[in-house]
Amino acid sequence: MSEAGEEQPMETTGATENGHEAVPEASRGRGWTGAAAGAGGATAAPPSGNQNGAEGDQINASKNEEDAGKMFVGGLSWDTSKKDLKDYFTKFGEVVDCTIKMDPNTGRSRGFGFILFKDAASVEKVLDQKEHRLDGRVIDPKKAMAMKKDPVKKIFVGGLNPESPTEEKIREYFGEFGEIEAIELPMDPKLNKRRGFVFITFKEEEPVKKVLEKKFHTVSGSKCEIKVAQPKEVYQQQQYGSGGRGNRNRGNRGSGGGGGGGGQSQSWNQGYGNYWNQGYGYQQGYGPGYGGYDYSPYGYYGYGPGYDYSQGSTNYGKSQRRGGHQNNYKPY
């Protein structure tokens, strides 16, 4: 078990004005949020409450439930194993389950995991300790708390011809799915023209589910792509959870380069990317798995298999960083 002295990166994406980010339906539902941290070192016994199942089963089964004995542990070395993690925390109390989240593509640790104590008092003991070190790294344990998400009623529609369809045509098409509360048609302030995307808010959540049954829709001859829209703050957190997966094979939209986008023209990509930098955006890919978790100090929102600490930048308009650990891990 080798030491990993380098920090594993976290980075926030830029979004400022009136912003909503468009994300896939998978992110909706319940989440989790993390609270303050603590320290230690130890040796362990097998998890007594998990003898009939694989490690992590109890944690996974209760992912949408409050559990006073559950902790999130961030900042782990890629070399730290589940046994190492369990051995360390056993000195604070009986550990009934333990898991480290792995990237299914690389088989490598994503640098964070979960501990489930039999007794909630063990969590307080962990938090009472000021610093925790494991495998040469300062780690950051936090309480795991369930957090219910608001119903999603707003969608992003990208790939539209800015000249058409008209607002009336957009309302006519999407009104078939349910009652529309509002339609936003963002403008290019320099050209004083519409951009190639809109936001639609329905009065209920059900129409959003219906619209998302198809990824692409054709409105007045324009093939458009549909995503769930949500506030930029949530989107920024979500970026680190489902990770670089959203951009992994995409170009730098903000600079008008590359990127798929379902056949949209480069000029649309360019305009869309510029507007994203003002507070709008959307992410294509999504790790399934643990969508809906929100460890907000770390931004592990919706941590799906695509997350990797080495996937530094995840927003369109910035180049990706790949490779090993980097010294800009910023949990707060």
UniProtKB/Swiss-Prot annotation:
It is found in: Nucleus; Cytoplasm. Residues 29-49 have a biased composition (Low complexity). The gene is HNRNPAB. The modification Omega-N-methylarginine is found at residues 245, 250, 253, 322. Ubiquitous. One of its GO terms (molecular function) is sequence-specific double-stranded DNA binding. Binds single-stranded RNA. Has a high affinity for G-rich and U-rich regions of hnRNA. Also binds to APOB mRNA transcripts around the RNA editing site. The modification Dimethylated arginine is found at residues 245, 322. The modification Asymmetric dimethylarginine is found at residue 322. There is a cross-link at residues 130, 203 (Glycyl lysine isopeptide (Lys-Gly) (interchain with G-Cter in SUMO2)). Residues 253-264 have a biased composition (Gly residues). Dimethylation at Arg-322 is probably asymmetric. Identified in a IGF2BP1-dependent mRNP granule complex containing untranslated mRNAs. Interacts with APOBEC1. Keywords: Acetylation, Cytoplasm, Isopeptide bond, Methylation, Nucleus, Phosphoprotein, Repeat, RNA-binding, Ubl conjugation. GO terms for biological process: cellular response to amino acid stimulus; chromosomal 5-methylcytosine DNA demethylation pathway; epithelial to mesenchymal transition; mRNA modification; negative regulation of nuclear-transcribed mRNA catabolic process, nonsense-mediated decay; positive regulation of DNA-templated transcription; regulation of gene expression; regulation of intracellular mRNA localization. The modification Phosphoserine is found at residues 81, 242. The keyword Disulfide bond does not apply. The keyword Glycosyltransferase does not apply. This is Heterogeneous nuclear ribonucleoprotein A/B. Pfam families: CBFNT (PF08143), RRM_1 (PF00076). Residues 69-154, 153-233 form the RRM domain. Residues 1-66, 235-268, 311-332 are annotated as: Disordered. GO terms for cellular component: chromatin; cytoplasm; dendrite; mRNA editing complex; neuronal ribonucleoprotein granule; nucleoplasm; nucleus; ribonucleoprotein complex. The modification N6-acetyllysine is found at residues 215, 318.
